[in-house]
Amino acid sequence: MITISDAAQAHFVNLLADQPEGTHIRVFVISPGTATAECGVSYCPPDAVEADDMELEYNGFNAMVDEKSAPFLEDATIDFVTDQLGSQLTLKAPNAKMRKVASDASLNERIEYVIQSEINPQLASHGGNIMLLEVTEDGVAILQFGGGCNGCSMVDVTLKDGIEKQLLEMFPGELTGVKDATEHQAGDHSYQ
């Protein structure tokens, strides 16, 4: 479920050595399955362990995961990276904002998953996002741009060279194209 690198495991063992006996770590997701989902790691004293917690065993410590967070932490990784600027703990949870969809899910569900987990996080750096409106019978995904993407002068490049290329590679034989249905209006909200 959660892959913790050897360096991160050693880091947790060192941190827990200064805590009361029986203290674990807790890995959790706040607002799982939403665009505002955030992951975190905290200490979990013995009296904070819940009956429905999932207990994961690692080298020298255990990690607790609450029942609600568990499906959103599937394929999560925790690493401890050291470079010239110092060291930091990184937690990557690709399914925190949206649960991974089954391989037999509908085309719309699979496209929506890619949009929420891969494309929108990239567009968010410009304050933008996209939404899937529909997939036509001839396999064209109809999208609507929002936020900073609405009215952006680079929207056509983003659509054709970025989003369409990515989606066609991921869904060969199922998608034939991508079209923008947005009525673009440049304004203060538009990315420049």
Curated annotation (Swiss-Prot):
Function: Involved in iron-sulfur cluster biogenesis. Binds a 4Fe-4S cluster, can transfer this cluster to apoproteins, and thereby intervenes in the maturation of Fe/S proteins. Could also act as a scaffold/chaperone for damaged Fe/S proteins.
Family: Belongs to the NfuA family.
Pfam families: Fe-S_biosyn, NifU
Listed name of the protein: Fe/S biogenesis protein NfuA
Taxonomic lineage: Bacteria, Pseudomonadati, Pseudomonadota, Gammaproteobacteria, Alteromonadales
Keyword field contains Cytoplasm: no
One GO-annotated biological process of the protein: iron-sulfur cluster assembly
Signal peptide: none
Keyword tags: 4Fe-4S, Iron, Iron-sulfur, Metal-binding
UniProt remark on cofactor binding: Binds 1 [4Fe-4S] cluster per subunit. The cluster is presumably bound at the interface of two monomers.
Cofactors demanded by this protein: [4Fe-4S] cluster
Record's subunit section: Homodimer.
HAMAP family attached to this UniProt entry: Fe_S_biogen_NfuA (MF_01637)
Residues that bind [4Fe-4S] cluster: C149, C152
Any one GO MF annotation of this record: 4 iron, 4 sulfur cluster binding
Top-level taxon: Bacteria
